[in-house]
Structures are given as C-alpha cells and as structure tokens.
C-alpha cells in the first residue's frame, strides 16, 4: 500500500524543505505471512497475510526507536488461513514480535532521511507561529470586543448567534 511510502516521503521532503521540523519519522507495513513478518509486502503477498501492522516512529537520542503510531488488522483471508491452513494466530506475543521487527526498518529509513538532509537540505528558517501576547494587547481586545461578544453570546438561537459573532470578527 502507498500509505507508508507517502509517510516516508512526506517526512523526507519536510526534512530538506527548510521548515523547522523535529523529524525524521518513518513507517513500515509488516504482514504476518506463513509465521514470518514480511516488511513492505507486495499486494500479491498480502493475500497470504494473517495479520498486518503499520508502525511509525522515530529514532531517539540514545539510538532506540520510539514507536508513535500503530495500525493493525487481520488480513482479508485470515480466517481461512488460520482455521483451514493452520497458520499462526496473531496473539499478543506474535504482535509484540512484529513491533520489534518494525524497529530496524524505522531506524534505517530515519537514518537515510538524516543523510539526505546533510546533502540536500535548505537552510532551516524560523517562523513566528504566534505573536507575543501582552497585557496591553489583551486589554485592548477586551475594550474593543467585550461588550459586543457579551451581547452576541446571549443570543439563544444558534444561527443568529453565529451570524452576530461573525459580524464582530
């Protein structure tokens, strides 16, 4: 599936974009096929998957992989594969093994993105995300909008209330 490719590409492109970004992050899809975790399975291989997981994470300062997101689900043929063919049931131990199997892939992809950044990144720019709010600014906004907002918020009907708030903005 292309979701994992998109995740890795989005992180890599953000790494070199010049935007402030605390990446890289990366992800891997694993499929439990014939009792083995297969990374980045082809569509044809997924037919034999009992269970699939998508795991995303990043490398932390000590070099370990911190998992940030897990999506999991049974393969479409799981019932048949488990009960008719005797394939491995994805119990807690098996799924934990899949999470551990994902970590080396996440690490390698994150390291590749870090290398890409070294050779291709634009200079990181700083952007002010929010203006500094001062007591004077709060007081000025209160002076300008308080009475009108009090009046608008006292309107019981939703649509007229929303219209009045929109007018005030």
Indicate where each model-derived feature is located:
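Polyanion-binding surfaces on beta-sheet-dominated domains and ring/shell assemblies
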Residues: 1-169
């Amino acid at each position: 599936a292309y979701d994992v490719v998109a995740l890795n590409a989005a992180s890599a492109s953000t790494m070199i974009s010049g935007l402030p970004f605390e990446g890289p992050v990366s992800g891997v899809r694993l499929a439990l096929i014939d009792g083995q975790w297969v990374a980045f399975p082809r569509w044809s291989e997924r037919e034999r998957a009992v269970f699939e997981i998508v795991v995303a994470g990043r490398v932390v300062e000590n070099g370990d992989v911190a998992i940030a997101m897990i999506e999991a689900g049974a393969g479409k043929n799981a019932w048949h594969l488990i009960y008719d063919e005797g394939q491995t049931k994805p119990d807690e131990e098996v799924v934990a093994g899949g999470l551990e199997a994902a970590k080396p892939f996440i690490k390698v992809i994150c390291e590749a993105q870090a290398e890409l950044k070294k050779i291709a990144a634009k200079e990181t720019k700083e952007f002010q995300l929010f203006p500094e709010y001062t007591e004077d600014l709060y007081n000025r906004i209160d002076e300008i909008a308080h009475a009108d907002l009090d009046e608008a918020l006292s309107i019981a009907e939703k649509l007229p209330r929303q219209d009045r708030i929109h007018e005030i903005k």
